[in-house]
Amino acid sequence: MHTLTLKRVLGFTIVILLLLALFIWGIGLETLKARQVDLLYLGQRHLMLVFTSMFFALLVGIPSGILLSRPAAKGFAEYVMQIFNVGNTLPPLAVLALAMVIIGIGDTPAIVALFLASLLPIVRNTYAGLCSVPASLIEAANGIGMTKWQRLRQVELPNAWPVMLSGIRIATAINVGTAPLAFLIGASSYGELIFPGIYLNDFPTLILGATATALFALILDTLLAWFGRRLSPHTV
């Protein structure tokens, strides 16, 4: 277990170092110093968009997955999941454009669009994880007199957690990768570096925004994996 953890840490460190090397080579120290204030400010705005939309996605997605996995919902759960699947086929840019038409420009439509983009993996994996809990465990929980709430909290959720965490990690990666597009509807993010870099053929600025986004995604995914191992060290 310790060897596996060490390999993961080493692999992550190598990836970070390679990205930093590409980062410095691509933009130069002068560009990094000139854009330092922008990088910090846009990083805070990017974090705000991701964390706010993920908070609401978790707040809605996990309870929805739990409700759909209950025996009373078996008859229509698959139909509801199909609706989520159809919604997920929409490109992120189309979702952002739709949110802009309905709500306007700024942070609010961006958060709504990122929330919708992140929702499906959380609902799907929560539902799949709970449905995959062995029937023998549920029967054993019923046999010792657990209530439905106790069974869910002490038996089903702990066993479904690895699958649920996988969905949360996927949703976070989608969210972080989509957040730069929020620049197109008036929300501040690393897109303010990426898209002007494309329009103006400014390669250093483009690399600065893209690398910052990639590092952000890697760091968040690593933190989520560590958090998952802390909660369930024998299964994650």
Swiss-Prot record:
SUPFAM superfamilies of this UniProt entry? MetI-like (SSF161098)
Q: Does the keyword Transmembrane apply?
A: yes
InterPro entries from the UniProt entry: ABC_transp_perm/SBD (IPR051204), MetI-like (IPR000515), MetI-like_sf (IPR035906)
PANTHER family given for it? GLYCINE BETAINE/L-PROLINE TRANSPORT SYSTEM PERMEASE PROTEIN PROW, OSMOPROTECTANT IMPORT PERMEASE PROTEIN OSMW
Taxonomically, which superkingdom?
Answer: Bacteria
Swiss-Prot/TrEMBL GO biological process terms? transmembrane transport
Job description of the protein: Part of the OsmU ABC transporter complex, which is involved in the uptake of osmoprotectants such as choline-O-sulfate and glycine betaine. Probably responsible for the translocation of the substrate across the membrane.
Q: What region holds the ABC transmembrane type-1 domain?
A: 43-224
Quaternary structure per UniProt? The complex is composed of two ATP-binding proteins (OsmV), two transmembrane proteins (OsmW and OsmY) and a solute-binding protein (OsmX).
Q: Which UniProt keywords apply?
A: Cell inner membrane, Cell membrane, Membrane, Transmembrane, Transmembrane helix, Transport
**Cellular localisation:** Cell inner membrane
Q: Belongs to which family? A: Belongs to the binding-protein-dependent transport system permease family.
Question: Know the name of this protein?
Answer: Osmoprotectant import permease protein OsmY
Q: How does it sit in the membrane?
A: Multi-pass membrane protein
Q: Extract one GO cellular component term from the record.
A: plasma membrane
Organism for this UniProt entry: Salmonella typhimurium (strain LT2 / SGSC1412 / ATCC 700720)
Tell me what turns on expression of this protein: Induced by osmotic stress. Part of the osmU operon, which consists of four genes (osmV, osmW, osmX and osmY).
Could you list the residue ranges that cross the membrane?
Answer: 9-29, 47-67, 95-115, 126-146, 180-200, 207-227
Predominant location of this chain? membrane
Q: Knockout: what is the outcome?
A: Deletion of the osmU operon eliminates the residual osmoprotection by glycine betaine in a mutant that is lacking the ProP and the ProU systems. OsmU deletion has no effect on the utilization of glycine betaine as an osmoprotectant when ProP or ProU are functional.
